[in-house]
Curated annotation (Swiss-Prot):
It comes from Escherichia coli O9:H4 (strain HS). Belongs to the AB hydrolase superfamily. Carboxylesterase BioH family. This is Pimeloyl-[acyl-carrier protein] methyl ester esterase. Residues 15-242 form the AB hydrolase-1 domain. It catalyses: 6-carboxyhexanoyl-[ACP] methyl ester + H2O = 6-carboxyhexanoyl-[ACP] + methanol + H(+).
C-alpha cells in the first residue's frame, strides 16, 4: 500500500482535514495554515498521485476517498477544494461517522454541464485531456489561469498557484487524466441530499469553473446545507480572501 503524504499541525480540539484541487498539492494551503493551526489540529494532505503522494496511478473517486481515509483521524471536519470537494463529499457519503462537518470550496457535485445544469462544457474537459498528452505543463498552467480570472488580485493569485505546482514534481499524466475523468463523469447531486452532518458550501462570485448559478439550485436541493459566496473571489477564495475564509471556518467550529 503506497503512503499518502500527510502533515499534521496545531493543537486544536477539532481536527480539520484540507484536500486540494486538481493538479495541485497541499502547499496551496500555506497562505492560511498558520492561522488555521491556531484553532484546529490541521491535516494537510497530498491526494494520491499528486505532490509528494507518488506511486499511485489514476484512481476512481471511491478509491481516492478510501486511500485518504486510511491515514485520517477518527473524526474531523473535512474540507475539500474543487476536485477535493468531491473527495470530501464521497467520504461524507460512505463514512458519515468520520465526518463532523463537510465543507466544500469552489466545488460542484457535478462539474460537467448537463441538461439544465450549469458547469464546464464536456468538450472543454475533453480538450484538457487531449492537451495533457501534448504539453501537460502548459495545460496545467492554463487551468490555473482560469481559476483566478476576473479577481482584483488575479495575477498574483495565479502566480501563487503556479508556485505551488512548480514547488514539487508534476503529477503523472495518467493521474491528471484520472482527475479530469472524475470532474467529467461524477454526479453527487442526489446522494448528497441524504447527508445529515453540518454542510457548508463556499463559492466565488467570479468563479469560471463552478458557475454561481448552481448556488441557489443546490440551496433548494440540499436545504440542510448552508452556502456563502465571496463577492470578489473566483475559484480560489482562500488565496484571494484568506482572513474572511478562516473566519468562516472558525465560526463553523463553534457549531460542531
Amino acid at each position: 500500500m503506497n503512503n499518502i503524504w500527510w502533515q499534521t499541525k496545531g493543537q486544536g480540539n477539532v481536527h480539520l482535514v484540507l484536500l486540494h484541487g486538481w493538479g495541485l498539492n497541499a502547499e496551496v494551503w500555506r497562505c492560511i495554515d498558520e492561522e488555521l493551526s491556531s484553532h484546529f489540529t490541521l491535516h494537510l494532505v497530498d491526494l494520491p498521485g499528486f505532490g509528494r503522494s507518488r506511486g499511485f496511478g489514476a484512481l476512481s473517486l471511491a478509491d481516492m476517498a478510501e486511500a485518504v481515509l486510511q491515514q485520517a483521524p477518527d473524526k474531523a471536519i473535512w474540507l475539500g477544494w474543487s476536485l477535493g470537494g468531491l473527495v470530501a463529499s464521497q467520504i461524507a457519503l460512505t463514512h458519515p461517522e468520520r465526518v463532523q462537518a463537510l465543507v466544500t470550496v469552489a466545488s460542484s457535485p457535478c462539474f460537467s454541464a448537463r441538461d439544465e445544469w450549469p458547469g464546464i462544457k464536456p468538450d472543454v474537459l475533453a480538450g484538457f485531456q487531449q492537451q495533457l498528452s501534448d504539453d501537460f505543463q502548459r495545460t496545467v498552467e492554463r487551468f490555473l489561469a482560469l481559476q483566478t480570472m476576473g479577481t482584483e488580485t488575479a495575477r498574483q493569485d495565479a502566480r501563487a498557484l503556479k508556485k505551488t505546482v512548480l514547488a514539487l514534481p508534476m503529477p503523472e499524466v495518467d493521474v491528471l487524466n484520472g482527475g479530469l475523468e472524475i470532474l467529467k463523469t461524477v454526479d453527487l447531486r442526489q446522494p448528497l441530499q441524504n447527508v445529515s452532518m453540518p454542510f457548508l458550501r463556499l463559492y466565488g462570485y467570479l468563479d469560471g469553473l463552478v458557475p454561481r448559478k448552481v448556488v441557489p439550485m443546490l440551496d433548494k436541493l440540499w436545504p440542510h446545507s448552508e452556502s456563502y459566496i465571496f463577492a470578489k473571489a473566483a475559484h480560489a477564495p482562500f488565496i484571494s480572501h484568506p482572513v474572511e475564509f478562516c473566519h468562516l471556518l472558525v465560526a463553523l467550529k463553534q457549531r460542531v
